[in-house]
């Protein structure tokens, strides 16, 4: 139980820090409009899966954002090392969060059902 609490707490802290780093430190225009929605940590805190959304729905913008985040991983890890009191900063993997689009799709289906 305590280990799960720790991974959740570290994940929330990484989420907050990565959002701040993307806004203030990363100058790559490909990551403009990217918001971190969730961070899932491995139990031993060695890896973090970082879920993000982007304002644009265009596939090309999604691919550019993914590429920009992958290129900025070193900068993000370095800044996390300065800001977090951890022995080892976890490896970061960026994954597009599809849950918001899925939720919007379900909302639209419900609205369509109401109209009938």
Curated annotation (Swiss-Prot):
One of its GO terms (cellular component) is cytosol. InterPro entries: KH_dom-like_a/b, RbfA, RbfA_dom_sf, Ribosome-bd_factorA_CS. Keywords: Cytoplasm, Ribosome biogenesis. It is found in: Cytoplasm. It comes from the Bacteria. One of its GO terms (biological process) is maturation of SSU-rRNA. Pfam families: RBFA (PF02033). Gene3D superfamilies: 3.30.300.20. One of its GO terms (molecular function) is ribosomal small subunit binding. The keyword Lipid metabolism does not apply. Belongs to the RbfA family. NCBIfam families: rbfA. Monomer. Binds 30S ribosomal subunits, but not 50S ribosomal subunits or 70S ribosomes. One of several proteins that assist in the late maturation steps of the functional core of the 30S ribosomal subunit. Associates with free 30S ribosomal subunits (but not with 30S subunits that are part of 70S ribosomes or polysomes). Required for efficient processing of 16S rRNA. May interact with the 5'-terminal helix region of 16S rRNA. This is Ribosome-binding factor A. It comes from Streptococcus sanguinis (strain SK36).
């Amino acid at each position: 139980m305590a280990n799960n609490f720790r991974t959740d707490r570290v994940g929330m802290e990484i989420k907050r820090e990565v959002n701040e780093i993307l806004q203030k430190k990363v100058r790559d225009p490909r990551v403009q409009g990217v918001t971190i929605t969730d961070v899932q940590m491995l139990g031993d805190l060695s890896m973090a899966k970082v879920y993000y959304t982007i304002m644009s729905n265009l596939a090309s913008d999604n691919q550019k954002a993914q590429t920009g985040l992958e290129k900025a991983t070193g900068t993000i890890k370095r800044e996390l090392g300065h800001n977090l009191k951890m022995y080892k900063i976890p490896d970061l993997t960026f994954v597009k969060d599809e849950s918001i689009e899925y939720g919007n799709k379900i909302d639209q289906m419900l609205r369509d059902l109401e109209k009938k």
